[in-house]
Amino acid sequence: MEKVYARTKGIRDDMVSGFCPGCMHSTVIKLIGEVLEEMHLLDKAACAVGVGCCGLHMDYITYDYFLAAHGRACAVATGAKRSNPESLVFTYQGDGDLASIGLAETISAANRGENFTVIFVNN
C-alpha cells in the first residue's frame, strides 16, 4: 500500500500533544517541522523559544532550540545568528512573550536588520 501521509522528521514520534483542545500551537509546530524537513534544513535550524505555552514547543521538536527568558527570544536569536551566520535561526513566541514584555527586543532587532525569522503565535 502506498503511504500517503507520514509524521515529519521535525517532530518527535514518541510524543502526543499536550496542548489544550483547539490550541493552534500543535498545528504551527507541525507546520514548522514539515517545512524544515521539506527544505532539508532540520540540521541547520535553531529556534529561540519563548516562555509560556510556547515553551512546550521544545518537548516536540527534533531540531536545535534554546529557551529564552521571558520576552528575550529576539535578543537570544540575535546572538545565535551572529555567532553562527550559516544557521537558520528563528524565534517561536506567543503574544505575552513577544507583544507584551518582549516588544522592545523585537522592534530593536527589526530596526537593526537582524537576519532571523520571528514566528508570532497569538494564542
Give the ranges of each region predicted by the language model.
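Conserved N-terminal glycine/acidic-rich loop preference
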Residues: M1, K44, E114
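Active-site diphosphate/adenylate-binding microenvironment
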Residues: T8-A69
